[in-house]
Amino acid sequence: METAFDIISLVLFIVVILLAFFRKVNVGVVAVTFGVIMVRIFGLTDKDLIGGFSTSMFTTLVGITLLFAAITQTGALDLLARKIIALAGNKMWVLPIMVYIAGFVIAGVGPGAVPALAIIPALAAIIAVEVGFNPLMLVLIGEQGLMAGRMTPITPEAAIITGAAAEANIANVMPTILVCQTLVTIVSSFVFWFIFKGHKVKQPLNPIERGTLEKFNAKQIIALLSIVLMLVLLIFVKVNIGVAAFAVAGLLFLFGIADDGKALKSLPWGTIVMVLAVGSLLNIVNKMGGIDLMSNALAKIMTKGTAT
């Protein structure tokens, strides 16, 4: 029976996904429900299930979303988005380029994709709604930019890739990866532009004249500077991104820039539970060999062509 635990764990994980999908229930809640049963089937304990909840992931998810909930309260992101739209005028094709470059720069200057994923989608979605673009299109284009930027030689991702390549006796891989990643993301951005009919939007849905926009107030300036502070803590002080975001959000609350109660209520708790709980169940599946089973099965059917 024990040798079949890998198959059973993998099958039960798939059942969790299907049940959550068809019953329209948060997959994280279903994952914990099945996790309680699975640890008893496999002779594990509740500690094994609880131990699968990543405190690091919790800190990152809650810290970043809390910080940006605080920033959003001030209206800083909305005003920044409107100023970008006013700057572009009727040249709608400029906006996707600006969003792509913003994603590339924020990820590429050192922090990598994680903090950029918190900044770019929020800004891109606001811009898209204001001008009449499909929000998903502009978010995806922004993410293409940060996926390219994360491959600059100074990001955490580059360090991981360089280390793995060095173990395989491959040197100086990042320049090639950066060029390839940039080219691929530019092409995919064009694809998104045409799929979501971005080229058909000729002028903003809500035209904005530069002179009609108010200036950033003190709270909004401090809120935007808090993003810079988070990046400084991350890049130069080497503070964990979740901890840095929590700390900066705390400062915004302490100095009355934002309301902590409203920020906490606005967090995407459903998504946070989903990510953490599914991770916990996957930890059980991994302990039982389900992940290795799936990896080995894929390895048997893969060729060089299908793998790439």
Predicted regions and their residues:
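Residues that define the loop-to-transmembrane-helix transition and helix capping
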Residues: 28, 93-94, 136-137, 175, ...
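Membrane-core helix-loop-helix motifs of multi-pass transport proteins
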Residues: 127-210
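Transmembrane helix boundary and interhelical junction motifs in multipass membrane proteins
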Residues: 28-29, 111-121, 138, 152-158, ...
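Short leucine-rich amphipathic alpha-helices used at interfaces
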Residues: 1, 7-8, 95-96, 102, ...
